[in-house]
């Protein structure tokens, strides 16, 4: 058989109802050759035309003419997209593309044909509902599903009701993969046949083969799609066919006795069953006799086509199947005319897959020419004229125009979904997603829908299903059962770490996101998925994953972006945000408030909504105040006065001097960009021709530079040389624009802008002409407070002078912050010195006293404090806080990307770049923007979990804070410093009284974690009360005893004792003798043990104990001397405070973590090498007074996978190993 020629090019699709080319630029994009070289590289965006999807799509203007939707999987022509426009801010889009390209992350896996959604329905979704449609119908009055027998329509749906229906595909869906044109090779195989049909229809393409899934039910899928366009009735068709054969078996046997043996009919009937599975090796399936039976079930003819060569052959590869067992008068529709035939075809020469041929909506009904009308199968040929209305030329019309409306079909599906939920307790769309992500992705095919439904239901009940908020992909928290049994990975890890496992403890495995309990009867670990949490998406590795309920809804956290579109949000992301069970257009603004009543002081944070499109969602000041007072002072007599005070406080906080001033609460991931979901912003449209990642203050050799041409090298050199000059020109231009910008709005014309909350009265916006004085509360970072009255015309420099008079702080040492979150009040730009400060009556400002600046005259000092970076201020003065936040987010995104490319976590990569923690670095800038810089202020970063940092004003940098030892400069060897200090501090702890530890007996150190006894509580542990802050939403917060911090702060500056490695050289003879033994190793200053873990000589132990006592005495003596010297330098006003510090500092240092009982000196250092990223053991113990030598770093052992243990009653699933 000769291979047919390739198909001719397809005609262009018809224009959409609303042409997106609304501007000359977009019109040029559609015309070839009408674009310049630069504009050919533009990026366009548009929305998916599917009304149930409408995802935002991005594509190059010169790219493919068809775009695949990243949300529903459909492929659309560019002309069919809605709202096509040029993207003027491609940065985020390119950033996402770069991430995907370099990491090989394509987001959610490509949707296969079963999961492509059209009008919100996928093929697999329809398959799941089909068994329900065989027994249920929809009540027209209520729209709810009812059993057919309750509607007096029998037990089984009668498919003859679909005898006059035909599906016509929408033109925009013709090329949708999995729904439109079949792509299994049928277009090539049927090319000649389709060309003949096309010529018979005035050269118009009006009958096309469409896709059906090849899952063993392709015949009934093809018939169902030809009838209603969906695979909804495959189950009913099979049951109808089986029932039809059983009821008319005698007639069939008589009609086909010459062709089909009587013994075959049992197999033929069994093959109709929906659950039929053919015996292994037996090629059974639906065939011609079943097509003939379906024609009689539907009361309409079915035409089977093949390639021209197949139709001309002697085989039964094509035929016309007539409903010959049904009287012709019963094969008519409501209009009295004969039901028009439907058409199916073979998809390949293998003839093992059926596909339907359907017409196109809006085009003429397809006609099949006489020469392609096959002979009748199984019945006399003259019956064709009896059951098919032939045209004058001998052809016939295919299908007809009576289609089920999409609106009715969606109502029918929604009614069946309710029944599915009632029967199985899970939504069919969720089952379809489980099949996509957990079966198809692993190559598992042929799994019955019942099995997938049961597996999905169990995963939901076990809290193992999570959905990514960015990609919408499902992830499963699953651990192989063999890992939890004896000999398994996790079982052995728990056994080796904690010894005998106990049923009253929970065992945490942070690297596997798993918490387990122990079953002593079965001797296995049992996963507790209620306490376990999946922390990253299995597809994109993002952290925005949330649990999924059985109905498919997501268990959102406050601040999460939902899938609901928002039209009036100020945040600009285009979606609503979840907060306390409701969906809002915006994230709330947050501000602190203090309640005082009856000697009790309570501090709370108020979350305020004020810009909602639905006014009922706006916060009501009286409701908020009443809830606060009722929450903390329930039933208090006379609390109405407190309510009124709270109302006034909230009104002061929410009164807007500028209606556009919107500073929402910072939620990590709340505005994370989804795939194809980025909104364009106003930036330069010049697109980069190369994408290059650069680090701060470092030169990076890029991949593109390896094969650069000479011209490219010259251009790059010119750009490098001219960059500073161009930047300076740009800065000067911005200065001139700012200086020459006229004020076009008269103060008298400013209207009062009331709040959008009807029940919440607000103040009028700030107006410089108001005659009222403004009272401002000022607080310094050393604890002083005052109320200052300002005139309406008070300028920045007058405010500085008022602060200097009130607190005796020179202007050059003042850093003024206002608003929430606090932001620095910058000095006025050139020419605007007389402008009043943007403060309102009732505002609060904070004064940060700068340190380490050279004192000078007031004028020069003020210049050094605020105007050193005037060029930078001129450039960045116009940037909003949102833009600054986006810039920091992009820097962090690039850092995370580079860390992933290097195969390291963020901390391991960042510690090798100390400049990131110094002035100008990304972490330094985040802390400065969010909370301000003050010496000794602590903070944490969500990208560096388990790490606490402190600002060192003298060095102007961030340093790593380790709970028990002090602060360390960031560098590649900082972990070595910490681990060395862990050994030293542990050795010191052996000399202290075990009873002096406040948490004695509650914690035990293990090689991989901490075990908490289930029956005991940590009542006597004091939480951290210092200046610690969390930037964003970190996963955990260290808790530090202030007494230990005061003590260790003194120890850090102590110079009386040398803790370096050199001190071991001057040990007494007993240690010299001990060290001469090749088996003795040093685990801390003055502490040695046996390498093989055996006990050493008791005399040596006693000598070690005495030596440690001498060291502690020396330390305490040095502390006393240091404190006496320090106290002598302090002012008399601070004397009482210093006495308290001396008492707390010279008190023996108590570690918050108890030691194993009994504590053995033979523990070895290898078991202490745990990662501080996942375990807080090093954070509890660690300090670094000496630098690990190079040899130690080279000989350090590989750290074992670690695990933790926690109380079974602990509910903190985010950080199972919390410590105090």
Curated annotation (Swiss-Prot):
InterPro entries xref list: OTU1_Ubl (IPR048857), OTU_dom (IPR003323), Ubiquitin-like_domsf (IPR029071), VCPIP1 (IPR039087), VCPIP1_N (IPR045827)
Null allele phenotype: Mice were born at nearly Mendelian ratios, although the birth rate was slightly decreased. Mice display genomic instability and premature aging. Cells show an accumulation of DNA-protein cross-links (DPCs).
Compartment annotation: Nucleus; Cytoplasm; Endoplasmic reticulum; Golgi apparatus, Golgi stack
Compositionally biased intervals (Low complexity): 20-35, 754-770
Pfam family, one: VCIP135_N
The entry's keywords: Acetylation, Cytoplasm, DNA damage, DNA repair, Endoplasmic reticulum, Golgi apparatus, Hydrolase, Nucleus, Phosphoprotein, Protease, Thiol protease, Ubl conjugation pathway
Entry annotated with the keyword Nucleus: yes
Principal cellular location given in the protein's record: nucleus
Function: Deubiquitinating enzyme involved in DNA repair and reassembly of the Golgi apparatus and the endoplasmic reticulum following mitosis. Necessary for VCP-mediated reassembly of Golgi stacks after mitosis. Plays a role in VCP-mediated formation of transitional endoplasmic reticulum (tER). Mediates dissociation of the ternary complex containing STX5A, NSFL1C and VCP.
Catalytic center residues: 215, 218, 353
Biased composition (Acidic residues): 1197-1207
EC number: 3.4.19.12
Catalytic reactions of this protein: Thiol-dependent hydrolysis of ester, thioester, amide, peptide and isopeptide bonds formed by the C-terminal Gly of ubiquitin (a 76-residue protein attached to proteins as an intracellular targeting signal)
Keyword Endoplasmic reticulum in annotation: yes
Sites of Phosphothreonine modification: 762
Residues covered by region (Disordered): 1-40, 724-778, 988-1008, 1113-1140, 1185-1220
Post-translational modification N6-acetyllysine, affected residues: 407
Modified-residue entries (Phosphoserine), positions: 746, 756, 767, 993, 997, 1076, 1196, 1205
Protein name, UniProt field: Deubiquitinating protein VCPIP1
Species the sequence originates in: Mus musculus (Mouse)
Classification via PANTHER family: DEUBIQUITINATING PROTEIN VCIP135, DEUBIQUITINATING PROTEIN VCPIP1
GO annotations of cellular component type: endoplasmic reticulum; Golgi stack; nucleus; synapse
Subunit structure and binding partners: Binds VCP and the ternary complex containing STX5A, NSFL1C and VCP.
Biased composition (Polar residues): 1208-1220
Entry's Gene Ontology BP terms: DNA damage response; protein deubiquitination; protein K11-linked deubiquitination; protein K48-linked deubiquitination; protein ubiquitination; protein-DNA covalent cross-linking repair; proteolysis; regulation of protein localization to chromatin
Lineage: Eukaryota, Metazoa, Chordata, Craniata, Vertebrata
Enzyme class: hydrolase
